[in-house]
Design a protein with these regions (language model features):
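Short coil/turn linker and secondary-structure boundary residues
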Residues: 33, 95, 104-106, 128, ...
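Short secondary-structure transition/capping motifs
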Residues: 34, 56-60, 88-89, 101, ...
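Aromatic/histidine-rich interaction motifs
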Residues: 117
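Nucleic-acid processing machinery
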Residues: 1-28, 40-54, 61-65, 69-74, ...
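Short, mixed-charge amphipathic alpha-helical segments
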Residues: 25-41, 97-107
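Active-site alpha-helical segments that house and flank conserved acidic catalytic motifs
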Residues: 77, 81-91, 149
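Hydrophobic or amphipathic alpha-helical targeting/insertion segments
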Residues: 86-114, 166, 190
C-alpha cells in the first residue's frame, strides 16, 4: 500500500512563504474564495491518491507553487495562469475540466486542459528535439499561457535537480531543456529564462566545461568589467550629444554561449575575444523607432 502523501517541515515552510508572496503579488486579480477553492481541490486530490512525488522525489505541490512564482515574477502571469499552474498537478483525468470550469472559469479550465493535451502529445512523440515538434507544440496550444507555464515549470525543475541522485533522469530532463524549452523561450522573447535553461543544461551535461568557463569568467571579471565601462563611455557621450534618450547595458555572455563559440572555433577559453555584449535601448515614440535606432547605429 502506497504511503499517504505528506510535506516535510521544510517543504511546508517554503510553501507557506510562496503562498504569502503570491497572495501579495496577484491578490488584486483574484476573485472571492479563489484561494479556499484551490486549497480544497488540491486537498481532495491528495486524499484521493492523485498526488505523488516525481522521479526526483520532488513535492509536486511545492513544485507547482515554485513554478507559479516564476510565472508571476519572470513572465508576468496573473490569476488564471497561476491557478491553472497550481491545479494541473492534481488533475486526475479529462472529466475534471467541467469541475474546474465551474469553480474557476473557462480560462483556467482551458489552460489546465491545454497542459494535459500537451503532455499527451509529448508522450506520443519519441523524437521531440526537432524544430517541427517545437512548432507543433506552439500550434497545438490553444492558449499561449500553456507554453509559458511549461517553460516556467522546466526552469523550476532545472533549478531543483542539482543534487539529485537520479543521474539518468537529470540527463534526460537537461537535454530536453536544451533542445526544446530553451528554443521555445527564445522564440517567445524570454531571453533570461532561455539563457538560464542553456546554462543549467550545460552544467548538468558538460560539468567540467561549465565550471572551467565559470572559473575563467570569475578570474577575469574585474578587468572585463573595467573594459566594458571603458568601451561604453564614448558611446554614451555621443548618444547624449545627439539628444537621444536611452539606456545602455553591458553584460558578459552566457557560459553556454561561450562554450558554443569554443566548439565552433575549436579553441580554448582564451581564444574567445567577444565575451561581452552591449545593449542600447532607445526611448522613442513608436513612429520614430526605426529612425532613431538607425541614428544611434550610425
Amino acid at each position: 500500500m502506497e504511503k499517504t502523501f505528506k510535506f516535510t517541515p521544510e517543504e511546508f515552510r517554503t510553501s507557506v512563504k510562496i503562498i504569502q508572496y503570491l497572495r501579495t503579488a496577484i491578490g488584486s486579480s483574484l476573485e472571492n474564495h479563489d484561494e479556499q477553492k484551490v486549497r480544497k481541490y488540491i486537498h481532495q486530490a491528495i486524499v484521493a491518491g492523485h498526488v505523488h512525488r516525481d522521479v526526483f522525489g520532488l513535492n509536486p505541490i511545492l513544485t507547482s507553487l515554485q513554478t507559479a512564482q516564476i510565472a508571476v515574477d519572470e513572465i508576468g502571469l496573473h490569476r488564471d495562469g497561476v491557478i491553472a499552474t497550481l491545479l494541473y498537478g492534481s488533475v486526475a483525468n479529462d472529466d475534471d475540466h467541467e469541475e474546474i470550469d465551474q469553480l474557476f472559469g473557462e480560462n483556467v479550465a482551458r489552460i489546465v486542459m491545454g497542459l494535459a493535451k500537451i503532455q499527451k502529445l509529448y508522450e506520443k512523440n519519441p523524437v521531440i528535439e526537432s524544430e517541427n515538434f517545437r512548432n507543433l507544440l506552439l500550434s497545438f496550444a490553444e492558449d499561449m499561457r500553456v507554453i509559458l507555464i511549461m517553460i516556467a515549470d522546466r526552469v523550476n525543475i532545472m533549478r531543483q535537480i542539482r543534487d539529485v541522485e537520479q543521474e539518468e533522469a537529470r540527463h534526460e530532463v537537461s537535454e530536453e531543456a536544451s533542445y526544446l524549452y530553451a528554443p521555445l523561450a527564445h522564440k517567445l522573447g524570454l531571453y533570461g529564462l532561455k539563457s538560464e535553461l542553456e546554462d543549467l543544461s550545460l552544467k548538468y551535461l558538460e560539468h567540467d566545461a561549465y565550471y572551467m568557463i565559470k572559473e575563467e569568467l570569475n578570474a577575469t571579471k574585474k578587468s572585463r568589467d573595467a573594459y566594458i565601462q571603458q568601451f561604453i563611455a564614448p558611446i554614451q557621450e555621443k548618444l547624449t550629444e545627439a539628444g537621444l534618450k536611452f539606456h545602455m547595458k553591458g553584460r558578459t555572455k552566457s557560459i553556454h554561449s561561450i562554450w558554443q563559440k569554443m566548439k565552433k572555433q575549436k579553441c580554448g577559453f582564451k581564444g574567445i575575444y567577444d565575451l561581452f555584449a552591449i545593449r542600447i535601448i532607445i526611448d522613442s515614440p513608436y513612429n520614430l523607432e526605426k529612425q532613431l535606432c538607425w541614428q544611434a547605429y550610425s
